[in-house]
C-alpha cells in the first residue's frame, strides 16, 4: 500500500475513533439516554451526559419524570458518566 493510502487509512481510523461514542462498559447505560425535560412545567437547571460530545451539558428539567440521565450538578454528571 502506498504512503498516501496508509495516510488516508490512518485518517479514517482516527475519525472513526473520535465519532464512536464511549461504550456502555465505561459508564451506566442510562448515560446514553437523551436529555428529557419530562411533562411538568418547572424550570430547574439540570445536567445530562451527551455521549457524542462526551461531556455533560446543561438543560431545563420540568421537575418530574424524565429519565436517569439527569443530574443536579455538573460534577455529579461527570463522576457518573464522563469518568
UniProtKB/Swiss-Prot annotation:
InterPro entries noted in UniProt: Kunitz_BPTI, Kunitz_BPTI_sf, Prtase_inh_Kunz-CS, TFPI/VKTCI-like
Reported tissue expression: Expressed by the venom gland.
Site positions per UniProt: Reactive bond for trypsin: 41-42
MF terms (GO), sorted A to Z: serine-type endopeptidase inhibitor activity
Span of the signal peptide: 1-24
GO cellular component terms, semicolon-separated: extracellular space
SUPFAM superfamilies xref list: BPTI-like
Main location: secreted
PANTHER family xrefs: KUNITZ-TYPE PROTEASE INHIBITOR-RELATED (PTHR10083), SERINE PEPTIDASE INHIBITOR, KUNITZ TYPE, 3 (PTHR10083:SF376)
Family according to the record: Belongs to the venom Kunitz-type family.
UniProt-recorded name of the protein: Kunitz-type serine protease inhibitor tigerin-1
Annotated source species: Notechis scutatus scutatus (Mainland tiger snake)
Amino acid at each position: 500500500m502506498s504512503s498516501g493510502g496508509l495516510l488516508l487509512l490512518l485518517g479514517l481510523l482516527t475519525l472513526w475513533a473520535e465519532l464512536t461514542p464511549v461504550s456502555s462498559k465505561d459508564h451506566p447505560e442510562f448515560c446514553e439516554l437523551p436529555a428529557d425535560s419530562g411533562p411538568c412545567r418547572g424550570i430547574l437547571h439540570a445536567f445530562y451526559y451527551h455521549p457524542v460530545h462526551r461531556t455533560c451539558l446543561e438543560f431545563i428539567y420540568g421537575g418530574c419524570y424524565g429519565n436517569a440521565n439527569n443530574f443536579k450538578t455538573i460534577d455529579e454528571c461527570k463522576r457518573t458518566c464522563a469518568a
